[in-house]
Amino acid sequence: MTKESIPKELLKLITGEEIMMFQELRIRIQELNYKTNLTRLIEGDDYWISQVYDSLWTFKENSKKIFDNKKFIDIGSGCGFPGFAYAITHPNSEIYLVDSSKKKTDSLKEIIKRMNFKNNIFVINDRIENVGRQSSFKKSFNIATARAVSNPSTVAEYILPMLEQNGLGILYCGKWRNEDNKNLENTLNVLEGKIMEIKSKSLPKEKGIRNVIFIKPKASCPDIFPRSIGKAEKYPLKG
């Protein structure tokens, strides 16, 4: 793909070197896609807008927050977005990609092996409920993201226990209603967290509306969270 075919909105956010990395990443995902079915969003604007731009605008258009040199965890990483996108554009950060599918984590490891990432990138094949109860990971991350994983209240229970006191959680959502806002606030009250900001963006090329919710701890998250496997999804916290 030529530089000219990459959407201009994305060209404003990334360097020439980063463009080449994203081009190579697309090829690596394509190579593995046929046997793992990592994603259908791999061609043209589906890749450059729905994957790359959608992952990056949150970090690149928010000048008030510093995202470099962080310990970062991507929950439910799937084909590697936003984790790989963050890794390419923030090469001094330490990256953890978590997914419960062994096929997907094996593919993520293979992509890392084939590419020349500058970061230390670690892939974890486990449920986030198990990862979040390990003392080596609990309350240790500066940034935690989740994209297209589950409802916001469930995702908040995955994210908050991973964050250190000044950490930032980033939830990528499609539609966002007043009811979602109320439910998330109730959940965060239990988790000793709060909503910092909600940003909405119309993605280029009519790729839809994206809402990004920034959350953070207001006190130490109780050690009983996250609950055991499936509890957060089946019984979301209601406050």
From Swiss-Prot:
Keyword Cytoplasm: yes
UniProt xrefs under Pfam families: GidB
Single GO cellular component term: cytosol
Source species, domain of life: Bacteria
Gene Ontology molecular function, alphabetical: rRNA (guanine-N7-)-methyltransferase activity
EC identifiers of the protein: 2.1.1.-
Annotated localization: Cytoplasm
Residues engaged in binding S-adenosyl-L-methionine: G76, F81, D99, S100, S101, I128, E129, R147
Keywords recorded for this protein, A-Z: Cytoplasm, Methyltransferase, rRNA processing, S-adenosyl-L-methionine, Transferase
Keyword Transferase: yes
InterPro entries found in the cross-reference section: rRNA_ssu_MeTfrase_G, SAM-dependent_MTases_sf
Family: Belongs to the methyltransferase superfamily. RNA methyltransferase RsmG family.
PANTHER family noted in UniProt: S-ADENOSYL-L-METHIONINE-DEPENDENT METHYLTRANSFERASES SUPERFAMILY PROTEIN (PTHR31760:SF0)
Biological function: Specifically methylates the N7 position of a guanine in 16S rRNA.
Protein's recorded name: Ribosomal RNA small subunit methyltransferase G
Native species: Prochlorococcus marinus (strain MIT 9515)
Lineage, opening ranks: Bacteria, Bacillati, Cyanobacteriota, Cyanophyceae, Synechococcales
Gene field: rsmG
